From Swiss-Prot:
One Pfam family from the record: XET_C
Disulfide bonds: C231-C240, C277-C290
Organism: Arabidopsis thaliana
Post-translational modification (record): Contains at least one intrachain disulfide bond essential for its enzymatic activity. N-glycosylated; not essential for its enzymatic activity.
GO biological process, one term: response to mechanical stimulus
Tissues of expression: Predominantly expressed in young developing tissues. Expressed in 7 day old seedlings, roots, nodes bearing flowers, flower buds and siliques.
Site-annotated residues for Important for catalytic activity: D111
Name of the protein in its database record: Xyloglucan endotransglucosylase/hydrolase protein 4
Highest taxon in the source lineage: Eukaryota
Length: 296
């Protein structure tokens, strides 16, 4: 796919057209809170900096180590959001991740992974979903903005019916509950939220051909928001005590509406560079869950 030389103009046109239509129902508005309300550092504490009373956090990667943090609680379903500004400049080999994951061998996982690139080349956003330890469900898109220039909002809506990935309230991917088709769906393993910044130059950029240029270090990823609105559960819990009664379980959040599907189609047509659902070399038979992905 060829990236437009004027993504800002395309985005302005898209938003102008959207404003003339009935707007989709987004998830509940995220509530920004300090880092320490919901999260704790997990490794390389000296490579993290907090500002403004913990309302902003920086993760720092150098040639010695990356760093990361995780949520205090574990959750079954909810809405999870973060404002992130990615490292700038030549970031080939550098990965910034924001994801949910359980901890056992047959784990569930819902991933945002931002793959760095050479200066002048667009960063790539990879999403993936693991169920029962099975992943290999990668989708990759170019973003329609420079994610290192300002904060943008990356969100996950997870309920019994679907998982939706949002960028600035625009849906970029859905993963539908296809249990009736024999596909496992994350519904009984509480997950923590994690974020990390690390060197992955063995695979992240052009399959590992582009290596991290440490002359450009340190690499800094910045965070704000730290929003969690989920059903908190113990790691041993198999169901959410409020299952079926929370706002994310209601009818309007069980599927995308027409406007959201239109926006998702725009992402597919203009910005998608890889979708495992359409990779017949890798998957000669379409994976069963892709039958629920109406835009595949």
């Amino acid at each position: 796919m060829t990236v437009s030389s004027s993504p800002w103009a395309l985005m302005a046109l898209f938003l102008m057209v959207s404003s003339t239509m009935v707007m989709a129902i987004p998830p509940r508005k995220a509530i920004d809170v300090p880092f320490g309300r919901n999260y704790v550092p997990t490794w390389a504490f000296d490579h993290q900096k907090q500002f403004n009373g913990g309302s902003e956090l920086q993760l720092i990667l150098d040639k010695y180590t990356g760093t990361g943090f995780q949520s205090k609680g574990s959750y079954l379903f909810g809405h999870f959001s973060m404002h992130i500004k990615l490292p700038a400049g030549d970031t080939a080999g550098v990965v910034t991740a924001f994801y949910l994951s359980s901890t056992n061998n047959e784990h569930d996982e819902i991933d945002f992974e931002f793959l760095g690139n050479r200066t002048g080349q667009p960063a790539i956003l990879q999403t993936n979903v693991f169920t029962g330890g099975k992943g290999n469900r990668e989708q990759r898109i170019y973003l329609w903005f420079d994610p290192s220039k300002a904060y943008h909002t990356y969100s996950i809506l997870w309920n019994m019916y679907q998982i939706v990935f949002f960028v600035d309230n625009i849906p970029i991917r859905t993963f539908k509950n296809a249990k009736d088709l024999g596909v496992r769906f994350p519904f009984n393993q509480p997950m923590k939220l994690y974020s990390s910044l690390w060197n992955a130059d063995d695979w992240a950029t052009r399959g590992g051909l582009e290596k991290t240029n440490w002359a450009n270090a340190p690499f800094v990823a910045s965070y704000k928001g730290f929003h969690i609105d989920g059903c908190q559960a113990s790691v041993e819990a198999k169901y959410c005590a409020t299952q079926g009664r929370m706002w994310w379980d209601q009818k309007e959040f069980r599927d995308l509406d027409a406007e959201q599907w239109r926006r998702l189609k725009w992402v597919r047509m203009k910005w998608t560079i890889y979708n495992y659902c359409t990779d017949r070399t890798r998957f000669p038979v379409m994976p069963a869950e892709c039958k629920r992905d109406r835009d595949a």
